[in-house]
Amino acid sequence: MSPDVLKRKLSAIANYLQDLRRHEGITFDEFMAHHYEIERILELLIMNASDIIMHLLSSKGEAPPSTYRSSFLRAGELGIISIELSRNLSLSAGLRNILVHEYEEIDYSVLYRSIPSALRDFTMLIAELDK
């Protein structure tokens, strides 16, 4: 991934984080009034992060991982991102699958509680990759 593309994708993640921050600290009822918007922001955060990680793995000669989850974990193993962040982001991959594929009924209380960790983890991703 070229440095320009990486910067552009990290900038997109920063913009999505700004959008998500508007919902930080809202009540559950307020969340439910905007849950489709928040779901989409979370989906975009996860997909952009996955795209970055897949490209960075590929640039290191790694075969494409079969899942988003495994791509985040492999990035941690290779030192592309910290182990802590790789574990946290791997959990977000499961959330993405639920949102996109509706494998399970969405538990909105879990989604609501995921806002602070998403803000923390994707901010950390920018900090670790924007070197």
Spans of features found by a protein language model:
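Solvent-exposed interaction patches of small proteins and small membrane subunits
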Residues: M1-K131
